[in-house]
Regions:
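Hydrophobic/aromatic beta-strand elements that line small-molecule binding cavities or substrate pockets
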Residues: 21, 38-41, 74-82, 103-106
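Beta-strand elements of well-folded, non-transmembrane domains
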Residues: 10-14, 56-58, 80-84, 95, ...
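Tryptophan-anchored aromatic micro-motifs
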Residues: 1-15, 89-91
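Short acidic/polar mixed-charge low-complexity motifs
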Residues: 33-35, 74, 97-101
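N-terminal glycine/threonine-rich, aromatic-flanked beta-hairpin/loop signature
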Residues: 15-55, 95
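Edge beta-strand at a domain terminus
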Residues: 42-44, 84-111
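A generic structural micro-feature
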Residues: 46, 68-72, 97
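An anionic, turn-rich surface loop/hairpin at beta-sheet edges
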Residues: 55-79
Length: 111
């Protein structure tokens, strides 16, 4: 994936959200309304994959994330397909092989 800032649609069987992600030197960091995603893209050319960790954060009564309310979730193993600055990352979690996750990412700016 090209280094930069991406507009991302995050989707699972249980949830869907819009967010942003940054990619730099293969490192992926993303956030939406309820989760933080971080990990690494691996491989070259058509053999690109990603391993991401996903953290769900709780919301305080104010609507702000509680720093100590982070809840760990399993690692995601994703295949990456991309054309013209758009990427689709899709796969499952280590804990639930039947679960499906999909991230549709569109490049918007340099870092």
């Amino acid at each position: 994936m090209r280094d930069g800032i991406y507009k991302v649609d995050f989707q699972s069987e249980k949830d869907a959200a819009k967010g942003i992600a940054m990619v730099r030197d293969g490192n992926f960091t993303g956030i939406d309304q309820t989760h933080v995603y971080f990990g690494k893209n691996e491989g070259q050319g058509g053999e690109l994959s990603a391993q991401l960790n996903m953290l769900m954060y709780a919301r305080a009564a104010t609507g702000m994330a509680e720093a100590l309310g982070m809840k760990s979730a399993p690692r995601l193993r994703l295949n990456v397909e991309g054309v013209d600055g758009r990427f689709v990352l899709s796969g499952a979690s280590d804990a639930e092989s039947r679960s499906r996750y999909e991230f549709k990412a569109e490049w918007v700016a340099e870092l």
